[in-house]
Amino acid sequence: MPSADSVFDYVVVGAGPAGCLLANRLSADPSCRVLLLEAGGRDNYPWIHIPVGYLYCIGNPRTDWCFKTEAQPGLGGRALGYPRGKVLGGCSSINGMIYMRGQAADYDRWAEQGNDGWAWKDVLPLFKASESHFAGASEHHGGDGEWRVERQRYSWPILDAFRDAAEQSGIDKVDDFNTGDNQGCGYFQVNQRSGVRWNASKAFLRPIKDRPNLTVLTGVQVDQVLLNNTRARAVKAFWQGAWHEFAARREIILCAGAVGSPCILQRSGIGPRQLLESLGIGVRHDMPGVGGNLQDHLQLRLIYQIRNSRTLNQMANSLWGKMGMGLRYLYDRSGPLAMAPSQLGAFVRSSPEQATANLQYHVQPLSLERFGEPLHTFPAFTASVCNLRPASRGRIDIRSSDMNSTPLIDPNYLSDSQDLRVAADAIRLTRRIVQAPALAAFDPKEYLPGPALQTEEELFEAAGKIGTTIFHPVGTCRMGNGELDVVDNQLRVHGIPGLRVADASIMPQITSGNTCSPTLMIAEKAAQLILKGAATQTYLNEDAIPTP
């Protein structure tokens, strides 16, 4: 157990997907001492591991930070819950388990903006390095990594029919969304092993738990990064009822996510001068971009009541249904309890001028009024659709120097008129798919937002009423070389030697799909960059060692 004056080669803050992978890679060198700090607890809560248990993890302080956004004018003044994992594995312990890389064009765009080494050709090997694909190694997939990818273990007639309806609407069927072009409709591949959630803790920490040079601490809340002049030397953290300094001889790497990483930087005096001075925080490095550029995927949840088919709604509202689901899962880890929240997906262009798919569907054999409430008692499915490349930008900032104060989260949803137009197009496209012959036998009736809403203005208003986060915040420590960029293409914080950020916050633009696996790729890249630098670096941060 480390003491207050412990010194490590690397201190990694945050044991989410990025932190778990990074700690694994850095500690592979037995001569390097690595410390991984996590604010949450161990991932021993049973509902983490049962796939449908995400319903009991989101909004649960045992596993979730339980953040909330500011009231959103674009959503009719509503404030949203903003789930972020607070447990070993981070969001990979509470998310939808979908394995999704995005599009080749996403990463090529990053590289075109001056981020050399981040094009699709550069990052594809990084995705493959950590992947254990059910079909084995191939041109597009890895077979020997730790991050397990499997087919789903349960199907529903209503989802098969939706896929047929999408095909009748001009959306081709596909079997693999992860080849660089995800256009089409198909079933998501998921991060599970034999019907059990496969989170980053299982993948990257458990196999190496006996490495003597790796220390993993839970229940550690990091307040700030401590500097010697401008160089990062240690983190100040609260652990086991006392304040500690954990020092790094080489580097500190923030993997605290799109909410946590900018907040730690700001409390460290690294951020917008005006904000820091208003909170009485000494400015160590004026960086106006810290906390800006917030992007998220806003999902529009269209619900359709159906006939002639069973959905999870009926099963979850029946004692016998619940018993049957439980017994089936106990028997062979299959059935509804083994299913990801969203099983069927589609990637579509909202209009012909889009170069690649800019809409993503998550189609679910269930419905509910809002997250945290019981499933409806009537049979229904939800066609959730989100704009993959929103133009709206928001911010995340601290409210005070106290690390226990909740951050100010303002995604600024639907503030850009372009996003409103895409939302209206998405609702119209969904209605067209649902009216296709393949779904006629189920007699779908629109429950939300309601068929009476037809004009452009009505659809704008409807989007604000049914829109909610799909939990993909990114971009708040943006990578690049501009005045508002926080890290360079090596993930080094501009102007602060010895400090990097390696998580979803560095994305210049959000990827076109779910963001967990791209975050793992970022950590894989960070590990390569750090180890390459360490091989040629003779300077060690001796100033990191606290003075007695």
Give, region by region, the residue ranges found by the protein language model:
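Conserved redox-cofactor binding core of oxidoreductases
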Residues: 111-232, 238, 301-323
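N-terminal glycine-rich phosphate/pyrophosphate-binding loop and immediately adjacent elements
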Residues: 2-128, 287, 297-306
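Glycine-rich loop(s) and the adjacent beta-strand/alpha-helix scaffold that form part
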Residues: 31-33, 41-43, 225, 234-324, ...
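Short loop/edge segments at beta-strand edges and connector loops
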Residues: 218-220, 285-287, 481
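FAD-dependent oxidoreductase catalytic-site/capping-region signature
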Residues: 2-8, 124, 130-179, 186-188, ...
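Residue-level detector of alpha-helix initiation sites
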Residues: 12, 16-21, 153, 258-259, ...
